[in-house]
Design a protein with these regions (language model features):
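Intrinsically disordered, low-complexity boundary segments flanking structured domains
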Residues: 4-8, 92-94, 193-195
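Aromatic side chains
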Residues: 5, 10-13, 68, 105, ...
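Short acidic, glycine-rich loop/turn motifs
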Residues: 7, 107-113, 133-137
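Electropositive, glycine-dotted interaction segments
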Residues: 118-237
Length: 237
């Protein structure tokens, strides 16, 4: 079940958007005991939520953001932001170097018993900027990250360097990137082996899906939940 969901710079949403299914500790909750699920001490999750707003207010784009997020788990394709999926104010022509193409997605879920996951993804027109998965076994505990990937080097080579940038789509840009990978439970030797196995970081897909294939329990459980249980669909009335 979803606890919290955040995203930024997606279609009509430029600023950070936050959505929570956590039931508030108010008298309203007590009047509707069938509208929430008690999963752990001090943790009640709403069963349903209604998103309301005027026409063209962003309701459909909110659902599209979840679909966009989910597709990288199902299709395992090249992870990057696309011009038609970032806010119009963040685009300056066709040149990704001139605009703000950084997109952020964060999903916190409860799966079963006292099993909580927090997944964070940042990407731009080059690829993944940051990706991490955290796990905790109780509400009062702190998240301990299962893995963390951070892009620590980026060199962009444009065939129009030295000339005034026109912002059109006639130039060709090549990116040279490097990442810092941290998997506490695997140790440095295994991290180095995984790093060498991924010959092209830029087009590697989500790291969590690779870790799931290697048998990491937490990466598999979260990825499986996103692919098979997260069902973002619109219901027009």
């Amino acid at each position: 079940m979803i606890l919290n969901y955040k995203f930024q710079n997606f279609m009509s949403f430029q600023d950070n958007v936050e959505f929570s299914m956590m039931a508030p500790n108010t008298e309203v909750k007590e009047r509707f005991p069938d509208n929430y699920v008690h999963v752990a001490p001090a943790c009640d999750i709403l069963k349903t939520a209604v998103i309301v707003g005027e026409n063209a207010g962003g309701k459909s784009n909110f659902v599209r953001s979840l679909k966009y997020f989910k597709k990288y788990f199902k299709e395992n394709e090249y992870v990057k932001s696309y011009r038609n999926r970032v806010h119009v104010n963040c685009c300056e022509g066709y040149c990704g170097k001139r605009g703000n193409t950084l997109q952020c997605f964060e999903l916190e879920v409860w799966l079963e018993k006292e099993c909580f996951y927090l997944y964070h993804l940042e990407m731009d027109f080059v690829g993944i900027v940051k990706e991490e998965l955290g796990y905790k076994g109780g509400v009062g505990e702190e998240y301990e990250y299962i893995f963390k990937v951070i892009r620590d080097q980026l060199d962009l080579d444009c065939d129009k360097d030295g000339y005034p940038c026109t912002g059109d789509n006639q130039c060709e840009t090549k990116a040279f990137v490097d990442y810092d990978l941290d998997i506490p439970s695997y140790g440095k030797e295994m991290e180095e082996l995984i790093s060498k196995a991924v010959t092209n970081w830029n087009q590697m897909g989500l790291f969590i899906t690779k870790l799931a294939i290697l048998g990491n329990e937490h990466a598999f459980r979260f990825s499986d939940w996103v692919k098979n249980s997260l069902c973002p669909e619109t219901n027009s009335v």
